[in-house]
Amino acid sequence: MTDHTMKKNPVSIPHTVWYADDIRRGEREAADVLGLTLYELMLRAGEAAFQVCRSAYPDARHWLVLCGHGNNGGDGYVVARLAKAVGIEVTLLAQESDKPLPEEAALAREAWLNAGGEIHASNIVWPESVDLIVDALLGTGLRQAPRESISQLIDHANSHPAPIVAVDIPSGLLAETGATPGAVINADHTITFIALKPGLLTGKARDVTGQLHFDSLGLDSWLAGQETKIQRFSAEQLSHWLKPRRPTSHKGDHGRLVIIGGDHGTAGAIRMTGEAALRAGAGLVRVLTRSENIAPLLTARPELMVHELTMDSLTESLEWADVVVIGPGLGQQEWGKKALQKVENFRKPMLWDADALNLLAINPDKRHNRVITPHPGEAARLLGCSVAEIESDRLHCAKRLVQRYGGVAVLKGAGTVVAAHPDALGIIDAGNAGMASGGMGDVLSGIIGALLGQKLSPYDAACAGCVAHGAAADVLAARFGTRGMLATDLFSTLQRIVNPEVTDKNHDESSNSAP
């Protein structure tokens, strides 16, 4: 996967993402425009994959290359030929089929044989000396679980001690969705070509891609002139959204935020949302909650303004606020329902999370000034489907949420997806497994709410908030690891993250001082 620390990624990964079907249609056009053949593109792909293998595993002396019966297999034949040419021992296993190979793959296969290479059946006993496996079985056209013979090869590769380099995409991972309906290669490195595919960034991608590498195959000039439907957002882009503040700015310039929630026993949720909003730069934060929570919240975070939630305090606060966040610890009893009914007609930007989403699923409506932030379980309730259906196509489900509920939808998870009308779609390339703990969603709500108050558009606030949230966790993970990370731990790094001009300066200075 891409580098999720604050360091610059050592491998250049683009921020544009293409559906695999669009790449397949576009690569022929690109080749024609640039005077290339598709076979020349295959040779470039094989060369790029070979270089990744050599760079990552310079001491590997016996490569096992697994070739499928398609153009992904053609790339594998090129890798095998290049490895053999430099004296590496290569064992190549090929999947046979009654169908002829695509023209380009057939040429690559012929070149391998002409170079003295041999092709073995896929069911042979693997040599004991194999110390690198190259996965070129299945490409980006896969739509379902691999068939049994390929699944057996995948399982064998995964159980073998040799590292695996996947060509274009790990076999068994769906390029459009990141779903894994059957067996899937667990790669240590993946080299993908021409453009990033969404399935490399969301769903199960992080479990199976390893370190992600990219090569445009020389199509940069053509790619630069194309519009893409999906964007990858990462920590490097925070400076695009979060500019240095004017020296004369005051607290009123940075947003007046009201946060509503914290029913009996859930004061922690509303406290985390409130502090996250402050740490993300909100000018003023008012919390409306149960009276029993007032003293503990003020003691824990005196910068918050904390009031009992009543109809009068809610009415006055809605008039005062620039932004409303509702849901953390709200509950689904009458207390929370009445507050949500009052907030529904708020005309300014608002964010609904947690129990607000569970209540929304019962009484759905469409609001264009609202950001919703469901995890897969909440998204399933909002769309009336199963969690498995949500996870099978996260991008499509995020778009469905926008179609049904309006505004901006943030479908949380590894490779969070952010969608907005009419066709804005982003994948968040930040965050880690340490965030799989209680309270992380409450912190995210506060961050996005704060950015809404700082005049970012709902879509930009959602994208920037998710990136800042994940990047703060990545700093912690790089230092302490992912196990045992708490939501409140993010506060120690969040302030750094939302001031990217300081972060960039510190990074540049440390880079310049390095020996």
Curated annotation (Swiss-Prot):
The keyword NAD applies. It catalyses: (6S)-NADHX + ADP = AMP + phosphate + NADH + H(+); (6S)-NADPHX + ADP = AMP + phosphate + NADPH + H(+); (6R)-NADHX = (6S)-NADHX; (6R)-NADPHX = (6S)-NADPHX. Residues 234-501 form the YjeF C-terminal domain. It comes from the Bacteria. InterPro entries: Carbohydrate_kinase_pred_CS, CARKD, Nnr, Ribokinase-like, YjeF_N_dom, YjeF_N_dom_sf. Residues 23-225 form the YjeF N-terminal domain. This is Bifunctional NAD(P)H-hydrate repair enzyme Nnr. It comes from Escherichia coli (strain K12). The lineage of its organism: Bacteria, Pseudomonadati, Pseudomonadota, Gammaproteobacteria, Enterobacterales. The gene is nnr.
